[in-house]
Regions:
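Generic, well-ordered alpha-helical scaffold segments in large soluble proteins
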Residues: 109-116, 155-165, 188-196, 236-244, ...
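Short hydrophobic/aromatic segments of transmembrane alpha-helices and their interfaces
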Residues: 140-142, 261, 356-357, 404, ...
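Active-site capping/gating regions of soluble enzymes
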Residues: 270-275, 279, 298-479
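A short glycine/serine-rich beta->alpha loop
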Residues: 172-178, 262-265, 348-352, 383-386, ...
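Conserved active-site and cofactor/substrate-binding residues in soluble primary-metabolism enzymes
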Residues: 52, 101-105, 117, 153-156, ...
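Short secondary-structure transition/capping segments
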Residues: 134-137, 386-389, 461-462, 565-567
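Flexible, glycine-rich loop/tail regions that form catalytic "lids" or insertion modules at the edges
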Residues: 4-41, 48-61, 67-68, 74, ...
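Catalytic alpha/beta active-site cores
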Residues: 1-82, 89-309, 327, 331-340, ...
Length: 569
C-alpha cells in the first residue's frame, strides 16, 4: 500500500546519499534527512518540506548548494521553458554590492573584489541622481554625484563601468539595484555590450535588474513616473528580456527596502510576496505566459537579527511555490523562489561600529541557514560612510570563512533544517504572513491597498515601535543603549567622499557627450515619443535611444509624455 511505497522511496533516497569525510575524519552524509522509518514522519517531511530542490522548496530552491565542488558533481538544471538556456552551476552565494564615485572607480573596486573568484557576480549601487533618472549636470545635484553609488549618465559611463569583464561568459553575471529608470539603465547595458562584442552577445548576457516599482511606492520613494506608466514600462522590459535575454532576470521583487524602511520581518515577507503575485497578474494581463516569465522572477530579502529570520526565507519559498502551482498553474521552474539576501543595514550602528562585524556575521549565518541563492554582506563602516576598501574586504572574507573555512555548509546540506525551534518559528511566521495576506485581500488587493496607504502606514508604525524600543531599552543594541563605551563617541572615523574634482569631471564628460550627439539626440527622443504614444515596446526603442541620449534627457522626455509620480495623500 501507500505506506510500503513511501518507505521504499525513503530507503532509496537514503541509500543514494553520498558520504563525505571531513578533514578531522568525521563521516557525514551530503544531505541531512530525518532519522526515521515512521511513515507519518516521512510523509510530513517529503510533502510538507520536500527534499532540497523539490516542491514546496522549503529547504532550498535547488538540490545542491554551497557544497565543496571538488567532491561532488555539478547539478545540471533543465533549460528554460520553450527553448531557453540551461544553467549548470552549483549555487555560490557571494555577490558583493559596490558603487562609488565615477564608473572607473567602481570598475576598480569590482576587479579588486573579484580578483580571486572563478564565478564573477557583480552587484551595482548607483548614486542618488542616477536613481532618480537625473543627469549629473542637473540643477542642485552636484553634491550627490558619485556619493553612495556610481554616477551613470550615458552609454559611455556604462562601458567604463564593466570594462575588462567577460560580459557573455557563463561564469559572469551582474546585478543592478535601480528601479524608476531601470529600463533606460538596462538598455544602456545591452547597448554597451553590443558595442563591445556585437549583437550576438545579447542572448548570452546574465544578470538581474531590480525594477520593483510597487515597493518604491510602499517604502523607498524612488518611483519617477505615475504608477500605471511605470508598470507599463516594466512590462515592456519583461516582455523584451523574456524573448531576447533568456539568462536575464528583469525584476528582483524586493523586501529589503521594505524592511529597511521599518517593516517587521513578517511584513517584509507578506508585502514582498503579495507584490510578486500582483506582478504575475499584470504580466499575464499583457498576454505573457507564466511558464515563460515565471522562471525569470527573482527576489531580494533583508536578513536581520530577529528570530523570524531563522525561517523567513523557508516560509517565502513555500508560499510562493504553493501559489504559483495552485493559483497560477505554473510549472516547477516558475515555482522556485530564487533569492538574493543582504544583511541588514538598519542593524548597523555608528557607535562602536566594529561591533557591526559580529552583527553581519550572525546575519550571514542566518541567510546561509535559509539557503539563500546569493548574498551580500554589509561592511561594518556603512553606518556612517560609503564602505572603505578595508571593511569591504572583511565583509567579503566573512562569506568565505562561513562557506569555506567552517564545516557548517560545505560538507552537508540541510544541517539545521527541521529542528523543533525552527519548526515553531516557521509555523508562526507562516500564520502571520497569511494573516497579512487576508488583510490586503480585504482591502481589494495590493494596488487598492496602496491607494489606502496600507503598506506605508504599517511600515511607519513598525518603524516607530522599533525606535521607541531602542530609546526605552526594550531592544538592546550593544554599544548604543547597552554596555556603551562613553569614550567611543570622541574617536575620529574615516568618511569616504567623492572628490569635487571627480564630480566636475563627470559633468564635463556628460556635456561633451551631449554636444556630440545634439542633433541625433533630438531625433532619437522623437522616435521614442512615437513608440510610447502609439503603444509600442518602450524598452526595445530605448536600446536605440541610449546611443545618443543621456539618462536625464530620456527621463525628461518621458515626463513630458506620461507625467510625474504623485503620491496619494
Amino acid at each position: 500500500g501507500f505506506q510500503k511505497e513511501l518507505l521504499n522511496r525513503w530507503r532509496k533516497i537514503s541509500s543514494r546519499i553520498e558520504m563525505v569525510t571531513t578533514p578531522t575524519g568525521l563521516p557525514l552524509p551530503r544531505l541531512a534527512l530525518p532519522q526515521t522509518d515512521e511513515p507519518g514522519d516521512i510523509a510530513r517531511y517529503l510533502f510538507g518540506e520536500g527534499l532540497p530542490g523539490e516542491f514546496p522548496f522549503v529547504n532550498s530552491a535547488y538540490s545542491e548548494m554551497y557544497l565543496a565542488k571538488s567532491e561532488i558533481r555539478p547539478v545540471l538544471r533543465s533549460g528554460t521553458a520553450e527553448g531557453g538556456n540551461p544553467k549548470s552551476e552549483i549555487e555560490e552565494p557571494t555577490r558583493l554590492f559596490a558603487g562609488l564615485g565615477l564608473a572607473e572607480d567602481t570598475n576598480r573596486r569590482f576587479h579588486y573584489l573579484t580578483q580571486q573568484q572563478k564565478n564573477i557576480r557583480l552587484s551595482t549601487a548607483f548614486d542618488g541622481p542616477t536613481l532618480y533618472g537625473l543627469d549629473s549636470d542637473s540643477d542642485g545635484v552636484l553634491g550627490k554625484v558619485g556619493e553612495g553609488g556610481v554616477a551613470i549618465d550615458t552609454i559611455e559611463d556604462m562601458e567604463r563601468l564593466y570594462a575588462g569583464f567577460p560580459l557573455g561568459d557563463e561564469h559572469f553575471s551582474v546585478s543592478m539595484t535601480i528601479n524608476g529608470p531601470a529600463p533606460a539603465i538596462l538598455a544602456m547595458y545591452v547597448a554597451a555590450a553590443k558595442r563591445r562584442f556585437g549583437s550576438d552577445i545579447v542572448p548570452k548576457l546574465r544578470g538581474t535588474i531590480q525594477a520593483d516599482i510597487l515597493k518604491e511606492v510602499q517604502a523607498q520613494n524612488e518611483i519617477i513616473f505615475p504608477l500605471e506608466a511605470s508598470l507599463r514600462f516594466l512590462t515592456d522590459m519583461v516582455e523584451f528580456t523574456t524573448a531576447n535575454l533568456p539568462r536575464w532576470y528583469p525584476i528582483s521583487i524586493s523586501g529589503y527596502h521594505i524592511a529597511e524602511a521599518g517593516a517587521t520581518p513578517v511584513q517584509q515577507a507578506a508585502f514582498t510576496l503579495s507584490n510578486g503575485f500582483t506582478y504575475v497578474e499584470i504580466f499575464r494581463d499583457r498576454g505573457l505566459r507564466v511558464n515563460r516569465f515565471g522562471p525569470r522572477l527573482s527576489f531580494f530579502l533583508d536578513c536581520g537579527l530577529e528570530v523570524e529570520y531563522l525561517a523567513l526565507a523557508r516560509v517565502c519559498r513555500k508560499l510562493w511555490a504553493v501559489a504559483m502551482r495552485d493559483v497560477f498553474q505554473a510549472d516547477a521552474r516558475a515555482q522556485r523562489f530564487k533569492l538574493h539576501t543582504q544583511t541588514s543595514g538598519r542593524s548597523l550602528v555608528a557607535q562602536e561600529f566594529k561591533n557591526n562585524l559580529t552583527r553581519t556575521a550572525v546575519e550571514l549565518l542566518l541567510a546561509c541557514i535559509n539557503a539563500t541563492n546569493s548574498c551580500h554582506s554589509n561592511s561594518a563602516d556603512e553606518a556612517f560612510t560609503t564602505p572603505s576598501q578595508e571593511f569591504v574586504r572583511l565583509a567579503a572574507q566573512a562569506q568565505a570563512i562561513m562557506l569555506e573555512e567552517t564545516g557548517l555548509f560545505k560538507f552537508m546540506m540541510n544541517t539545521f533544517g527541521g529542528s523543533p525551534g525552527m519548526k515553531i518559528v516557521e509555523r508562526t511566521v507562516e500564520e502571520a504572513v497569511l494573516a497579512e495576506f487576508r488583510e490586503i485581500d480585504r482591502l481589494g488587493g495590493v494596488l487598492a491597498a496602496i491607494e489606502h496607504r496600507y503598506q506605508r502606514s504599517q511600515i511607519q508604525l513598525a518603524a516607530h515601535r522599533y525606535e521607541q524600543q531602542i530609546n526605552e531599552g526594550a531592544r538592546p543594541i550593544i554599544g548604543l543603549n547597552r554596555y556603551r563605551d562613553e569614550a567611543e563617541g570622541l574617536r575620529p572615523v574615516k568618511v569616504i567622499r567623492t572628490p569635487r574634482k571627480k564630480k566636475h569631471l563627470q559633468v564635463e564628460r556628460l556635456q561633451r557627450f551631449k554636444r556630440r550627439h545634439r542633433d541625433a539626440a533630438e531625433s532619437a527622443l522623437d522616435e521614442l515619443s512615437e513608440v510610447v504614444e502609439h503603444g509600442g515596446n518602450e524598452f526595445a526603442e530605448l536600446i536605440k535611444t541610449v546611443e545618443h541620449c543621456s539618462l536625464g534627457q530620456i527621463t525628461a522626455r518621458l515626463h513630458e509624455l506620461v507625467g510625474h509620480y504623485r503620491p496619494a495623500i
